Amino acid sequence: MISFSSFYQQIADSTLQHWLEDLPAILGKWQREHKHGNLPKWEKVLNKLNYAEPDSVDFVDSVTIGSGSQLSAGQQQKLENLLRLFQPWRKGPFNVHGIDIDTEWRSDWKWQRVRQHISPLAKRTVLDVGCGSGYHMWRMLGDGAARVVGIDPSPLFLCQFEAIKRLAGNQHPVHLLPLGIEELPPLDAFDTVFSMGVLYHRRSPIDHLYQLRDQLRMGGELVLETLVIDGDENTVLVPEDRYGKMNNVWFLPSVAALMLWLKKCDFTNIRCVDVDTTSLAEQRSTTWMPNESLVDYLDPKDINLTIEGYPAPKRATIIATKNQPNFDLI
C-alpha cells in the first residue's frame, strides 16, 4: 500500500504542520475506499520497481533519471514493460534509465512558457493543484523549490508519480496526495500555488479561485493557467454540451473577464503573461497514450474550431498576488 508517512514526518516542523490535524484521517479514508479496482494491481507493479539509486538526475532542463548506462538491455526492456502498465501517460515527457516516456502532452513546452514569468521558486513551498502525474512538480523542484506538494484525486496519476519517484530516489521533497482542493483546509501556508488546466473543469470557478487563495500565505503568488476565449470583460463561453469532446468543461472566460474575477477575489498585481493556442504537436497520441487526442477533438475541416464548432483551445497564464481582503465588498 502506498504510504504517506514520510510526508507527515517532513511537514511536522514546517508551516504545514497544522495540516496533520486532518490529513491522516482524510488519506486513510481514501485508502480504504480504493482497496478495489485497479489500485491494488498498480501497487503490485510499483513493488517491482526495485532499482539502485540512479547515477544522475536532471530536473532543471528535463525530467531525466539515470544516464541510461546502469541497466542492461534486458533490464531496460523489463523496466519499460513495467512502466507501460501505467498507460495512458498524459503529462511529461520523462526519460528513465534511457527509456523515453513520450507522453500525450509536451508539458515541458508549457513549463518553458510559464517559468520565465513567475517569481523564483528557490526555497519556496509550492502547491500544484491538479498536478496529474507530477511532471511540473519535478521541474519546480529543479528550479529550487524547498518542498513541492501536488494534489490530484486520480489513482493512476498517483501511481505514475510514485513510479517516477521510486526510480528517482524517495529522498526528494516532492509529494503527491490523492485529494481534490475541496478536501484541503485553508492552510494559508504556500508561497506559490499553481492551478494549470483545472479552472474550466470547475462548476464554480469563483469558488475555485477562493480555494486557491486560501492555500496561499499573504503576499503569496498564484499561477493560473486555463482555457480562454477572445472578448471583453463580459465575455464567457458556457458550452451547451461538450467542448472538444469533454463533458466536464463549464466556463471559458476571456482574459479580461478572468482578470476581473481575480480582482473580485482580492488578488492584486494581476497580469496576463502568456496566451497560446494549443498546437497539434503539443498534444497528440503516442505509443504511451494511444487513445484519441487533440486532432480528434477539432473540426477536421477547420482546426481553428472544436468538433462542436467552438473556438479551438487557447490557454492563458495569469499571475496574481494574494492581498488582504477588501471588507468593504463583503
UniProtKB/Swiss-Prot annotation:
<protein>
    <recommendedName>
        <fullName>tRNA U34 carboxymethyltransferase</fullName>
        <ecNumber>2.5.1.-</ecNumber>
    </recommendedName>
</protein>
<dbReference type="GO" id="GO:0002098">
    <property type="term" value="P:tRNA wobble uridine modification"/>
</dbReference>
<feature type="binding site">
    <location>
        <position position="200"/>
    </location>
    <ligand>
        <name>carboxy-S-adenosyl-L-methionine</name>
    </ligand>
</feature>
<feature type="binding site">
    <location>
        <position position="91"/>
    </location>
    <ligand>
        <name>carboxy-S-adenosyl-L-methionine</name>
    </ligand>
</feature>
<keyword id="KW-0819">tRNA processing</keyword>
<dbReference type="GO" id="GO:0008168">
    <property type="term" value="F:methyltransferase activity"/>
</dbReference>
<dbReference type="InterPro" id="IPR010017">
    <property type="entry name" value="CmoB"/>
</dbReference>
<feature type="binding site">
    <location>
        <position position="315"/>
    </location>
    <ligand>
        <name>carboxy-S-adenosyl-L-methionine</name>
    </ligand>
</feature>
<comment type="similarity">
    <text>Belongs to the class I-like SAM-binding methyltransferase superfamily. CmoB family.</text>
</comment>
<dbReference type="Pfam" id="PF08003">
    <property type="entry name" value="Methyltransf_9"/>
</dbReference>
<dbReference type="GO" id="GO:0016765">
    <property type="term" value="F:transferase activity, transferring alkyl or aryl (other than methyl) groups"/>
</dbReference>
<comment type="function">
    <text>Catalyzes carboxymethyl transfer from carboxy-S-adenosyl-L-methionine (Cx-SAM) to 5-hydroxyuridine (ho5U) to form 5-carboxymethoxyuridine (cmo5U) at position 34 in tRNAs.</text>
</comment>
<feature type="binding site">
    <location>
        <begin position="152"/>
        <end position="154"/>
    </location>
    <ligand>
        <name>carboxy-S-adenosyl-L-methionine</name>
    </ligand>
</feature>
<feature type="binding site">
    <location>
        <position position="196"/>
    </location>
    <ligand>
        <name>carboxy-S-adenosyl-L-methionine</name>
    </ligand>
</feature>
<dbReference type="InterPro" id="IPR029063">
    <property type="entry name" value="SAM-dependent_MTases_sf"/>
</dbReference>
<feature type="binding site">
    <location>
        <begin position="181"/>
        <end position="182"/>
    </location>
    <ligand>
        <name>carboxy-S-adenosyl-L-methionine</name>
    </ligand>
</feature>
<keyword id="KW-0808">Transferase</keyword>
<dbReference type="InterPro" id="IPR027555">
    <property type="entry name" value="Mo5U34_MeTrfas-like"/>
</dbReference>
<feature type="binding site">
    <location>
        <position position="130"/>
    </location>
    <ligand>
        <name>carboxy-S-adenosyl-L-methionine</name>
    </ligand>
</feature>
<comment type="subunit">
    <text>Homotetramer.</text>
</comment>
<feature type="binding site">
    <location>
        <position position="105"/>
    </location>
    <ligand>
        <name>carboxy-S-adenosyl-L-methionine</name>
    </ligand>
</feature>
<feature type="binding site">
    <location>
        <position position="110"/>
    </location>
    <ligand>
        <name>carboxy-S-adenosyl-L-methionine</name>
    </ligand>
</feature>
